[in-house]
Regions:
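Residue-level detector of conserved, function-critical positions
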Residues: 18-175
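Bacterial Sec-dependent N-terminal signal peptides
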Residues: 1-22
Length: 175
């Protein structure tokens, strides 16, 4: 508990001079190490708790400027939240955690479809693809008709209708 109070105090001192526009949240946890399952919360520069302890099963993001990534308690979804704790979208699960940011974008999910968001928490390409790989060099391989096949402990996507899109969601030729 002393660490939690100390952490809140430090967060207050560090961010005391910030304006609302530059406001951000700092993750505080009551344990020696931050690991999945350790209760944590987010506080603002005034020391006010914005996200209470235990609201989420795990908080991946240590400082929320625009976007925080957390795991819900009730069903284990990985979601993006803003600095007001508003849910923005569900994050695509990859390698037992949230999708990696590549080329400034990461994958999100809505109603079983995949789209893309940026590091600011803005949806750049609405979820509309059945399968979608990460962006690399400005393009991503996607499909509207694909199936998932098990390959050992991993899964692979198969499709006869792959195509490429740019960061605007426009279909392009592979370069």
């Amino acid at each position: 508990m002393k660490k939690l109070i100390f952490g809140i105090f430090v967060a207050f001192l560090i961010t005391h001079c910030s304006s609302d526009k530059n406001e951000y949240l700092i993750k505080i946890y009551d344990a020696e190490y931050d690991e999945i399952g350790v209760p944590s919360c987010y506080v603002n520069s005034k020391g006010d708790t914005v996200v209470p302890i235990g609201k989420y099963y795990y908080c991946y993001t240590d400082t929320i400027r625009n976007l925080g990534i957390v795991i819900e308690n009730k069903n284990g979804r990985i979601i993006g939240i803003d600095k007001n704790a508003k849910e923005l979208f569900e994050v695509f699960k990859y390698d037992n955690g949230p999708d990696y940011i590549q080329d400034g974008l990461f994958r999100i999910i809505k109603n079983g479809k995949i789209g893309y968001a940026n590091e600011n928490g803005e949806i750049v390409i609405e979820p509309k693809y059945d399968c979608a790989y990460p962006f690399k060099n400005g393009i991503a391989r996607v499909s509207n008709k694909c199936s998932t096949k098990k390959s050992g402990e991993h899964s692979v996507w198969e499709s006869d209708d792959w195509f490429y899109i740019n960061k605007k969601g426009e279909q392009v030729e592979k370069q």
